[in-house]
Amino acid sequence: MKGFILALQFFTRIPININIDFNEKNIKRAFYFLPLIGGLIAGLVLIPIYFLPQKYIEISGFISLLLYLFLTGSIHLDGVGDTIDGFFSARKKEKILEIMQDPRIGTYGTIGLNVFLLLRYINYSTIIPDAGLLILAGIISRLSGLAVVVFSKPAKDTGLGLLFHKSASKFSFFFWLVLVCFLSLFTPEIAAFSKIQGTFILVERLKYLLLPLTAFILTFIIIRISYKKIGGITGDVNGLIVELTELAVLSTSFFINVHL
């Protein structure tokens, strides 16, 4: 339970007044629960969407957006703004890292944040009747973040990034990878919170593996860009990956339903 509580305390703003030592052992445990935390956040964000009348979907979508910002403390969105500011500055590594650490936000970061917030609001206000997709997208996006911590190198030799890299377990990633691939096969049922309708045909369900595949391809691309720009990964870059892959999973699901 220490890992779960620490994950809640670090990755959400849910008030839990329990003192957990922030050490390598407990951090390792916390990463086992990271994808679960993503699903939990998405589930809580669903409450206004699912229980308010559909005719008020624009209002419930806005409330859900505010709830998401509150639950996460904008921890990942902060990384979106910082990363976009740094990467679009066309500077050398040291200057890019300096820009990313600057608490002020620049023009590129402001534009990027507004785009991400708009896309998230659009998803929240149009996702009915596939609201359950938010939970699957939340899980997959945090799995992408876990992949970054496990398999990429930090851009700096100090700080939380290095501690996380040392603490994260490959087993936790592969455990969740298998589970996510299994869950993806049941995307229609998860989306609608329903039982299997008709006969389950595995070949027809394989298309839903595009959901985690899209997330991992995007993750790989951003990692390569980050290596080229700053020689590794920072928490800000990981925040961008989490936000981007969540939106990508939702968009990919829409594409599958319409075209495949």
Curated annotation (Swiss-Prot):
Which top EC class is given?
A: transferase
Please write the reaction equations for the catalytic activity of this protein.
alpha-ribazole + adenosylcob(III)inamide-GDP = adenosylcob(III)alamin + GMP + H(+); alpha-ribazole 5'-phosphate + adenosylcob(III)inamide-GDP = adenosylcob(III)alamin 5'-phosphate + GMP + H(+)
- Where are its TM segments located? 31-51, 57-77, 108-128, 131-151, 173-193, 206-226, 240-260
Keywords (A to Z) from UniProt:
Cell inner membrane, Cell membrane, Cobalamin biosynthesis, Magnesium, Membrane, Transferase, Transmembrane, Transmembrane helix
EC id: 2.7.8.26
> Cross-referenced Pfam families, in alphabetical order?
CobS
Keyword Cell membrane (UniProt): yes
Cofactor(s) essential for the protein: Mg(2+)
Q: Report any one BP term from Gene Ontology.
A: cobalamin biosynthetic process
Q: Name one GO cellular component term.
A: plasma membrane
- So what does this one do? Joins adenosylcobinamide-GDP and alpha-ribazole to generate adenosylcobalamin (Ado-cobalamin). Also synthesizes adenosylcobalamin 5'-phosphate from adenosylcobinamide-GDP and alpha-ribazole 5'-phosphate.
Q: What is this protein called?
A: Adenosylcobinamide-GDP ribazoletransferase
* Organism expressing this protein natively: Treponema denticola (strain ATCC 35405 / DSM 14222 / CIP 103919 / JCM 8153 / KCTC 15104)
Q: Which gene encodes it?
A: cobS
